[in-house]
Amino acid sequence: MVRRFKPAVKYRRGSRTHGWGRVGQHRKSGSSGGKGMVGFHKHKWSLVMKYGESGTGWPFYGKHGFKQPPTIAIEWRPINVGSLSDIIKELKKEGKIAEEGGKYVIRLLELGYNKLLGGGHIDVPVIVYTPAASRTAVEKIEKAGGEVRIIPLIHK
């Protein structure tokens, strides 16, 4: 479709200020009261009150929350029920899992995992020892005729 009007900038070409006044207007950050959060405690205080949470100045001022020290933070290494079902035969060949009463006994910590999640399907009855498991993972394993036993996780 044919344009009826040229873009405004085409008309402004050749003029020094493109319609923004005499000297240096509409440039850099002087026209906005400073860069970024400059002036939030002075001339931009009304913005803090308008957009901050209930007049407290949050999230503009103060420290919020905390970061756990790495010495006590737990690094989760999860595995899904479906992935566990896929590797059971390989683990049996390697001798990493035992069989007890027709059920495979799997200790996730020895395999390098510390959480069991509920993605996928399982149809083999297993007994899983793990520090943590999701509700759906427990339901799926119990539906297959197995059980999940929660063991304490000792972290450094």
From Swiss-Prot:
GO cellular component term of the entry, any: cytosolic large ribosomal subunit
Region (Disordered) location: 14-35
GO biological process, one term: translation
Protein origin, superkingdom: Archaea
Keyword field contains Oxidoreductase: no
Annotated GO MF terms: rRNA binding; structural constituent of ribosome
PANTHER family: 60S RIBOSOMAL PROTEIN L27A, LARGE RIBOSOMAL SUBUNIT PROTEIN UL15
Family: Belongs to the universal ribosomal protein uL15 family.
Main function: Binds to the 23S rRNA.
Self-association state and partner proteins as the record states: Part of the 50S ribosomal subunit.
Protein name: Large ribosomal subunit protein uL15
Organism phylogeny: Archaea, Thermoproteota, Thermoprotei, Thermoproteales, Thermoproteaceae
Gene: rpl15
